[in-house]
Amino acid sequence: MRIDILSKEYPPAIYGGAGVHVTELVSALRARGDLDVRVHAFGHPREEDGTTGHPDLTELTGANAALTTLGVDLSLAAACEGADLVHSHTWYANMGGHLASLMGDIPHVLTAHSLEPMRPWKAEQLGGGYRVSSWVEKTAYEAADAVIAVSAGMREDILRSYPSVDPERVKVVHNGIDSELWQRAVDEDVVRRHGVDPDRPSIIFVGRITRQKGLPYLLRAAAELPPEVQLVLLAGAPDTPEIMAEVESLIETLRETRDGVVWVPTMLPRNEVVAMLSSA
């Protein structure tokens, strides 16, 4: 059985949780040994066997990001010819999965990591493209053969956002974790290198700078932390310049009244994230 997985993110280009999810899913499916798992990701060519990168169409250079995305989706759909099942992740790849399903008369499964109707602030990022991304998602969800929600709450949100979707087609499959990779591992050298004092208590945030993560709320609340507590932020990949500016301003204000505010704006290797989490 051939399964084609479509995703905007895939190593080495990962900036959020959906990319991590897809990476682990592909690894687990390929480990079975009885499936032909192919990955179609946005961006540059990949060296991994069975994985293809699909760059932006040069004809759409400078266009709204939503239109650029649709250009890549056409490439994804064409590449899925011959697949038995297509599985797409996030609105970026959903239209690729939908078109592949129509062209090949094959099942389309999609996993819901977020929902466009619940992220109206994305109009800051995409402008009119937000209406396009919302249309893409609605079209794909209503036509999909199955929709995977990563939580019961997400399932409720899907059915509320898209009431015409048959509830029987929406299944919950919770996100998992590789407990062998994410073992506690103290490494004070790594912690100190990033400016954290391992002898002081700390609270840590790991995630993208995006509205749904609620980082500005944390930064405002952090003013109430005991003075000996450090606030460690492993936060980058902002959705928009506006939220980046807001976070930068809040961090600057917080640092005026307390020390121990550590911000690492780059994405760290997993072993360093483990070390930072282990010190919190």
Model-identified regions with their sequence ranges:
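Nucleotide-activated donor-binding/catalytic signature segment of Leloir-type glycosyltransferases, i.e.
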Residues: R200, A235, M244-N271
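Carbohydrate-associated surface elements
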Residues: G153, G176
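A short helix/loop element that forms part of the nucleotide-sugar donor recognition site in Leloir-type
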Residues: Q183-V196, V247
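Nucleotide-sugar donor phosphate/pyrophosphate-binding loop at the beta->alpha transition
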Residues: P107, P117-T139, E156
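Short His-centered aromatic/hydrophobic patch
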Residues: S88-A93, A112
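Short alpha-helical donor nucleotide-sugar binding micro-motif in glycosyltransferases
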Residues: V274-A280
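A conserved mid-protein helix/loop that constitutes part of the nucleotide-sugar donor-binding site
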Residues: V20, P201-E224, A245
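N-terminal subdomain of nucleotide-sugar transferases
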Residues: M1-E47
